[in-house]
Amino acid sequence: MLEVELDIFSGMPNPKWLLSDREEKELLDRVIAEPTQISPAYTPDEQFSLGYRGLIVREIKTDESSWSKARLASASPLPNEFRVGSKPGTQATATWLLQTSEMKYKQSRVTDELREVAAGGVALVQSSGGAVDLANSTILDAADNVEYSYFPTVTGEGAHTPGGGGIVAEGATWFPCGANYFDANANFFNDPAHIAKNNCYCFASNHRADSRYARPGRRGGQPATSITCAGVIAGLYADGWKDGCQPNGLTIVLVIWPNVDYHFYRLVTGGPSWWWGHKPGGTPAKYTDDCGHSLYQVNGSGYAPNNCCRGNYTNFCGYFYQNNSTAFVA
């Protein structure tokens, strides 16, 4: 029995549905005809943008279905979990798989809005900083490193700076706290045994909880119910996040795909470069945005969560703080 997951959300549970035996047989024929169209479900080697990241197919039960029989056959190379749609030339199968969610009885929760987003295909980010281990690198001060000291012209809104003022959002201001806790630990969250089990809120809270759909407020007994700035902020408050500096404090940013999903960024280094990191759902944590820009500043110019490429996460909800020793999620 095969389950399909539309990998599209960062925080909320992704839509899932089951394939019929006839659909399993067609998928089997497609994969056997062109096995290179599938890729590992989760790997640190692919840097995904926010939004649509393909479809994950997994065998949830061994039965008499076409796929189970083929996989149990001797010398069968078929995996029990894989991703479709993340490679060039695989969109036909991905499009067909998405169409299998349209039967009402499957109750897949795939809306017209999600179908429209998925129709745009997967955006793999060519990341200049994706492989950088900031925890052990010498580029924390980008101003002293030529490779990380150049920015293309930033049009529109400039990057926020600590205490810079002029920030309009429902949440808090980015304060220049004197007791920050910084941890550029994307590699820790990208451990193959944990990468798929932690979402953006786990990374923001610096808590590798292995809770794939950790939700603001659940730990505090008041899980966010509306996917709006106000709704998710209420959940943050229940989990102990504050509007002002905290001892040994984490600094995070909340952004919203209106009424659909939430996403977080975490400040991972101090000034003058102010690097930010984030983790799109169950895919790798990284220090770049959807356009491949590294999330840091040089002499006050560059990219931060407020002005980086965020796809459909258009609502900027502000800055929040918590003591790192108490920032647990559920």
Q: Where are the predicted features?
A:
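Cysteine-nucleophile protease catalytic domains, especially the papain-like/related folds used
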Residues: 150-239
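Function-determining sites in protein domains
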Residues: 1-157
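Surface-exposed patches in mature extracellular/periplasmic domains of secreted proteins
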Residues: 38-47, 211-223, 241-247, 253
